[in-house]
Amino acid sequence: FSNCSALTGIEIPVNVVNIGRTAFESCSALASIIVDEGNTVYDSRGNCNALIETVTNTLMRGCDNTIIPDDVTVINGFAFNRCSGLTSIRIPASVTKIAIDAFHRCIGLTSIIVDEGNTVYDSRGNCNALIETATNRLIIGCNNTIIPDDVTSISDYAFYGCNAFESIIIPSGVTTIGQNAFEECISLESIELPESTTFSMLRPVMATLRPYLAL
């Protein structure tokens, strides 16, 4: 169903036992995911509007209306790819692994909240970003992100498709900016950089920034 942009809902029957990672990639209008209660491999527990692998508690695919259940432990790559109607997401304390491309091109995302009990990730200071706590690495940002002062690196594709924000301030503690961190940030007009910024630090993102900024 990749790129079925008009698909609004999907029902997974009891006999389905194998679903590919990108089966519902770029289904930008998807708002409802229901798995038959008799299915022994997948579920959509608690009417969460998500496809979950039951044994591993892995969220395989979400949609605009997904509420991540409290017992999910992993969020797969491209799980929310192009969920353009997704405006906010809450990461439960149980989640210990999130792929860096899990929220690619979620152009409407304005709020990211991580439960305070999560020991792997946080959204410190209401920053509206997903941060890996141990490394102070910003993994996923959104249109309302304010990068905390203690962040030291920005992941590849961290702000991919955040097309509404016009400016961003990079704190002085940031020493690494990943490849394509600001890809498709079409409204971005200014980036405030610390004095410590070096050309080698900016090199990975120069190509993607050039269409939007006067560099």
Please annotate each region the language model reported:
Residues C4-N18, S28-N49, V55-V74, C83-K97, ...:
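Structural signature of tandem-repeat unit edges
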